[in-house]
């Protein structure tokens, strides 16, 4: 009789009570061909510990928020102090003001900000606001860019550059997504064609400035600046979805690196220090349309709750310290350089890249350009699954999808990075 692990037993039990046994699909490990996910017992620093007491070097960091590492002592201390004063008030609190001021200080393109509870709420609200501000209905998103699970975003590209979006999840009415247009990332021709056809109907373009849900694809040939220009030419708004990249690739987000000013920005992950939070902000004249200042309705029972705000304030204080992003970026660069050198040593078709505390792994030669969602689909996804399984079995916890970026924290040590490189080198040698 097979001895099952505690994770296997828990997963079987979870499936009786939770659809698919998880509360977010990627966590089931199905996309990487695994029979069961690892159930986590606790986390500290750069490590996860599962219910079978296996220890993992964690390169997911709760999908991005844990830039300081798990259970940072300073963040824990302020949360514990706040808990004694209440978990949620359903009323304004000083912490909301303090976190808003800090975000605006670090991201000057944001003049006012509204807090919500998730990245999905942030992007959904930003789209509603853009439509109200422009008095237009259509939006442009990019194939492969993920902006949460709101109906208007669950759209795949139809055939041809001018195709209207089609739902890619049951339960999403075609009438809901008929105003969602889908273009190809890094392809200005597809954008220009949409504006030519729907010139006075497009409220906004929403884009991940670095496509972290296509592993990690950078904008090419001034792509973001060109999006800014075409929006200006057509009186449309430009929305940067920096839920992933905000305070992760740089202190001022991707917009500070590429020096492109969006009208609206969505945030999440890092700004909550590990607590559930999202935000959208931008030009004051646009944000003043949000209720109660204006007519665009948005609300939330737990929005701006003092626990999340407190964790966010302390996290942003710590990452604002001089040299933080230099050190974080050096860690990511060491990992990426080591992986690339290991692959090159064994002529293994692989390359990695990074920016700030975010990195991407591509199972194809570095001579092959991966600039679009279609390009990513041509990489060796089967080999990624094998790599994932090997690394997991040897104590390295990577994102369980070839389409997801990885994250490093300030808590990762040189030894953690060197162990990761050594394991990858062995895999490259054997495959």
UniProtKB/Swiss-Prot annotation:
Organism encoding this protein: Francisella tularensis subsp. mediasiatica (strain FSC147)
Protein name: Glutamate-1-semialdehyde 2,1-aminomutase
Pathway note: Porphyrin-containing compound metabolism; protoporphyrin-IX biosynthesis; 5-aminolevulinate from L-glutamyl-tRNA(Glu): step 2/2
Top EC group: isomerase
Cofactor: pyridoxal 5'-phosphate
InterPro entries (alphabetical): 4pyrrol_synth_GluAld_NH2Trfase (IPR004639), Aminotrans_3 (IPR005814), Aminotrans_3_PPA_site (IPR049704), PyrdxlP-dep_Trfase (IPR015424), PyrdxlP-dep_Trfase_major (IPR015421), PyrdxlP-dep_Trfase_small (IPR015422)
Keywords: Cytoplasm, Isomerase, Porphyrin biosynthesis, Pyridoxal phosphate
Subunit structure: Homodimer.
Homology family: Belongs to the class-III pyridoxal-phosphate-dependent aminotransferase family. HemL subfamily.
GO BP: any one term: protoporphyrinogen IX biosynthetic process
Location of this chain's protein in the cell: Cytoplasm
Recorded name of the encoding gene: hemL
Reaction catalysed by this enzyme: (S)-4-amino-5-oxopentanoate = 5-aminolevulinate
Modified residue annotations for N6-(pyridoxal phosphate)lysine: 269
Recorded GO CC terms: cytoplasm
GO molecular function, one term: pyridoxal phosphate binding
Gene3D superfamilies: Aspartate Aminotransferase, domain 1, Type I PLP-dependent aspartate aminotransferase-like (Major domain)
EC number(s) stated in the UniProt entry for this protein: 5.4.3.8
Native organism taxonomy: Bacteria, Pseudomonadati, Pseudomonadota, Gammaproteobacteria, Thiotrichales
């Amino acid at each position: 009789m097979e001895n099952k692990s505690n994770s296997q037993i828990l997963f079987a039990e979870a499936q009786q009570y939770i659809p698919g046994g998880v509360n977010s699909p990627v966590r089931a490990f199905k996309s990487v061909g695994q029979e069961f996910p690892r159930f986590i017992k606790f986390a500290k620093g750069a490590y996860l510990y599962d219910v079978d007491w296996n220890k993992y070097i964690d390169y997911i960091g709760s999908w991005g928020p844990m830039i300081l590492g798990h259970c940072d002592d300073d963040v824990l201390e302020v949360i514990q102090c706040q808990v004694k004063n209440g978990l949620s008030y359903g009323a304004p609190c000083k912490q909301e003001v303090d976190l808003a001021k800090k975000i605006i200080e670090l991201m000057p393109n944001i003049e006012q900000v509204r807090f919500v509870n998730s990245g999905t709420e942030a992007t959904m609200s930003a789209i509603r606001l853009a439509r109200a501000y422009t008095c237009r209905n259509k939006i442009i998103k990019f194939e492969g860019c993920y902006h949460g699970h709101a109906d208007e975003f669950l759209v795949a590209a139809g055939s041809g550059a001018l195709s209207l979006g089609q739902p890619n999840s049951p339960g999403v009415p075609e009438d809901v997504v008929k105003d969602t247009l889908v273009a190809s990332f890094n392809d200005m021709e597809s954008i220009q064609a949409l504006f030519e056809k729907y010139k006075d109907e497009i409220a906004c373009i929403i884009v991940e400035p670095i496509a972290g849900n296509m592993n990690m694809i950078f904008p090419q040939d001034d792509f973001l600046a060109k999006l800014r220009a075409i929006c200006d030419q057509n009186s449309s708004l430009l929305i940067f979805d920096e839920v992933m990249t905000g305070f992760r690739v740089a202190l001022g987000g991707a917009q500070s690196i590429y020096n492109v000013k969006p009208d609206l920005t969505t945030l999440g992950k890092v700004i909550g220090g590990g607590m559930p939070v999202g935000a959208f902000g931008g030009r004051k004249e646009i944000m003043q349309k949000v209720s109660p200042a204006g007519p665009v309705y948005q609300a939330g029972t737990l929005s701006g709750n003092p626990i999340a705000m407190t964790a966010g304030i302390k996290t942003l204080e710590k990452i604002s310290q001089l040299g933080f992003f230099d050190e974080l970026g050096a860690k990511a660069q060491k990992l990426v350089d080591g992986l690339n050198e290991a692959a090159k040593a064994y002529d293994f078709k692989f390359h990695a890249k990074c920016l700030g505390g975010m990195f991407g792994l591509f199972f194809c030669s570095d001579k092959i350009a991966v600039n679009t969602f279609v390009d990513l689909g041509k990489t060796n996804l089967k080999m990624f699954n094998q790599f994932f399984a090997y690394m997991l079995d040897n104590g390295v916890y990577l994102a369980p999808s070839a389409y997801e970026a990885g994250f490093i924290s300030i808590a990762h040590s040189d030894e953690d990075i060197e162990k990761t490189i050594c394991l990858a080198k062995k895999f490259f040698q054997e495959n």
